[in-house]
C-alpha cells in the first residue's frame, strides 16, 4: 500500500514530467467504438458488455407468467483507475513520455500528438462522466451506462414499480458506487420518490453491509499465492522485450508490460478507444485474460473456500426477500456495490462452477469455466426474478443481459427453478457456512445480521462518501 502523501508526491512528479495534455479533445471518430471485441480479455476493467454465453434463452418473462419480484445487484459504471492501479500506469507512462528517441513499431502512434488519458490525479477512483472524459465523443462513460441501464430496467420491470413509487436504492459509500446509484435513480424519471440509502464499507458495519469482504478479518488476498505464482508470465516478458527491441533504451520491465493492459482498459473507459490496446497480440490478450481469471478465482471466487461464507451474507438476505415477496409492498430491490462483492455473491449462489479448479499449467479452452470479465464488467448487473405461472412460482437469474440457469434446477418456464425447490437449493448452498463465524466478524463488529433491506425506513443510512 502506497502511503497517500508519498503517492501524491510521486504522482505530481510523474505528471509534471509527462507531455502536456489538453482535456476533452476530439479523437479520430473512426476509432471510437471499434475495440469492443477486446472487452472480454481485460479482466472486468473495460467497458460493459453482455454475458457471452447466453445459451439462447430469451430474457422475456415466459408467456403466461406474471413477474412478482425483481432484485438487482449492480456494479458501479466505467471508471478511472484506482490509486494503486494508477501508480503502475504512471510509472510506465513516465518512462514512455521521457523517451528521447523516435517511437518505433507498436509505439509509433506516440509520434502523432498522443494525449495521455489521466490529466489530473483528482480523477482517480472516479466514475467516468460526460464532463470528465478525455474525449467528448466517448460512448463508454459510467454516467451514461447507469442512465441507459435505468431506462432499460424501467422498460422491462416498470409495471412492478407502478404501485410503489416511494422506494430506496441501496449503495455502499464508495463515491463512484454512490454516483452510479444516483445516475440510475435520475434516469428512472421524476415519477418516483427515491431515497439513496448509503451503507458504510467500514468493517464496523459487520454483517449489515453490501461489502461483506471488508468486514471479514480472515480474508487474505495472499492465501493462494503459491498457486498463482506457478502460472507462467513469459508473455509479459515477451511484450517488454518486443517494445524494448523496437525502441532501444526504453527499458520497460515485465511489471510495466502488465500495467499496459490496465492502461488499455481504463483508457477505453475515459476516451472510447485506446491505441495502447493495439500493442497486444491475440495470444497475449488470451494469456492476460486467463491470468486475471486465475487471480480472481483464487482470491474472490470458488477457488478460495472462505468466499462462499462471505457471499452467504448477501445471498441469504436475497433469498429471504424472495420468501417474503407476497407480504412486501416493495417489489423492486436495487443495490449497488463493488465487483468482488458481486463475485462473492455469485459464488455462493452457485452461478459460477465450483466443481473444478482452474489449472495454472496452461490456458484451458474446453474446460475454461470461469471468466471474470463475463461476470463483472464495469456496470455489471445481476437480476433475480420471481414470477408466477398459473398457481406456481419460479425463480431465475439474469446476469449481464443473459439468463444463467441454476445447473441443477432449471426445469421451470424460461429455464427457471420452481420456488420450493429453489429454497431447498439455497439451503444446500448455505449449509455449513456462516459469514459471521467463518470470517471472525466479532473481531471488528457486533452486527450479526444484514438488516438494511427491512429497517431502511426507520434507520436512515447516510454514511459519508469515500473516494475509493
Swiss-Prot record:
It comes from the Eukaryota. It is an enzyme of class 3 (hydrolase). One of its GO terms (molecular function) is acid phosphatase activity. Its EC number is 3.1.3.2. The active site is at 76 (nucleophile), 339 (proton donor). GO terms for cellular component: cell periphery; fungal-type cell wall. It catalyses: a phosphate monoester + H2O = an alcohol + phosphate. GO terms for biological process: invasive growth in response to glucose limitation; pseudohyphal growth. Glycans are attached at residues 98, 163, 193, 202, 238, 251, 316, 357, 391, 457, 462. Keywords: Glycoprotein, Hydrolase, Signal. Pfam families: His_Phos_2. PROSITE patterns: HIS_ACID_PHOSPHAT_1, HIS_ACID_PHOSPHAT_2. Residues 1-20 form the signal peptide. Belongs to the histidine acid phosphatase family. This is Probable acid phosphatase DIA3. It comes from Saccharomyces cerevisiae (strain ATCC 204508 / S288c).
Amino acid at each position: 500500500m502506497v502511503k497517500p502523501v508519498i503517492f501524491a508526491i510521486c504522482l505530481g512528479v510523474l505528471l509534471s514530467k509527462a507531455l502536456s495534455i489538453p482535456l476533452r479533445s476530439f479523437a479520430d471518430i473512426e476509432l471510437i467504438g471499434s475495440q469492443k471485441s477486446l472487452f472480454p480479455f481485460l479482466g472486468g476493467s473495460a467497458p460493459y458488455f453482455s454475458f457471452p454465453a447466453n445459451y439462447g434463452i430469451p430474457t422475456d418473462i415466459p408467456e403466461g407468467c406474471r413477474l412478482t419480484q425483481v432484485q438487482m445487484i449492480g456494479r458501479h459504471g466505467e471508471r478511472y483507475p484506482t490509486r494503486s492501479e494508477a501508480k503502475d500506469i504512471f510509472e510506465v507512462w513516465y518512462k514512455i513520455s521521457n523517451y528521447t528517441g523516435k517511437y518505433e513499431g507498436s509505439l509509433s502512434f506516440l509520434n502523432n500528438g498522443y494525449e495521455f488519458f489521466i490529466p489530473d490525479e483528482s480523477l482517480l477512483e472516479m466514475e467516468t462522466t460526460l464532463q470528465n472524459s478525455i474525449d467528448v465523443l466517448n460512448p463508454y462513460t459510467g454516467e451514461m451506462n447507469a442512465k441507459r441501464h435505468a431506462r432499460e430496467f424501467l422498460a422491462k420491470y416498470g409495471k412492478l414499480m407502478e404501485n410503489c413509487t416511494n422506494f430506496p436504492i441501496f449503495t455502499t459509500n464508495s463515491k463512484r458506487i454512490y454516483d452510479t446509484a444516483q445516475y440510475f435513480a435520475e434516469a428512472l424519471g421524476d415519477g418516483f420518490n427515491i431515497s439513496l440509502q448509503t451503507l458504510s464499507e467500514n468493517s464496523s458495519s459487520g454483517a449489515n453491509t453490501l461489502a461483506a469482504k471488508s468486514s471479514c478479518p480472515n480474508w487474505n488476498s495472499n492465501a493462494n499465492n503459491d498457486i498463482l505464482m506457478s502460472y507462467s508470465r513469459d508473455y509479459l516478458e515477451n511484450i517488454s522485450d518486443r517494445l524494448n527491441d523496437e525502441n532501444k533504451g526504453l527499458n520497460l520491465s515485465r511489471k510495466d508490460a502488465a500495467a499496459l493492459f490496465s492502461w488499455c482498459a481504463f483508457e477505453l473507459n475515459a476516451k472510447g478507444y485506446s491505441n495502447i490496446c493495439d500493442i497486444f497480440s491475440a495470444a497475449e490478450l488470451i494469456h492476460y485474460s486467463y491470468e486475471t481469471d486465475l487471480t480472481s478465482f483464487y482470491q474472490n471466487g470458488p477457488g478460495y473456500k472462505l468466499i462462499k461464507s462471505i457471499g452467504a451474507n448477501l445471498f441469504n438476505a436475497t433469498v429471504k426477500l424472495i420468501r417474503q415477496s407476497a407480504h412486501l409492498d416493495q417489489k423492486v430491490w436495487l443495490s449497488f456495490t463493488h465487483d468482488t462483492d458481486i463475485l462473492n455473491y455469485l459464488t455462493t449462489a452457485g452461478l459460477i462452477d465450483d466443481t473444478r479448479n482452474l489449472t495454472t499449467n496452461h490456458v484451458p479452452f474446453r474446460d475454461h469455466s470461469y471468466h471474470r470479465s463475463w461476470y463483472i464488467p464495469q456496470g455489471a448487473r445481476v437480476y433475480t426474478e420471481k414470477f408466477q405461472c398459473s398457481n406456481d412460482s419460479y425463480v431465475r437469474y439474469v446476469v449481464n443481459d443473459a439468463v444463467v440457469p441454476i445447473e441443477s434446477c432449471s426445469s421451470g418456464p424460461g429455464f427457471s427453478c420452481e420456488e420450493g425447490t429453489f429454497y431447498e437449493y439455497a439451503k444446500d448452498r448455505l449449509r455449513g457456512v456462516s459469514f459471521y463465524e467463518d470470517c471472525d466478524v466479532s473481531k471488528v463488529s457486533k452486527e450479526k445480521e444484514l438488516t438494511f433491506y427491512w429497517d431502511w425506513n426507520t434507520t436512515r443510512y447516510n454514511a459519508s462518501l469515500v473516494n475509493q
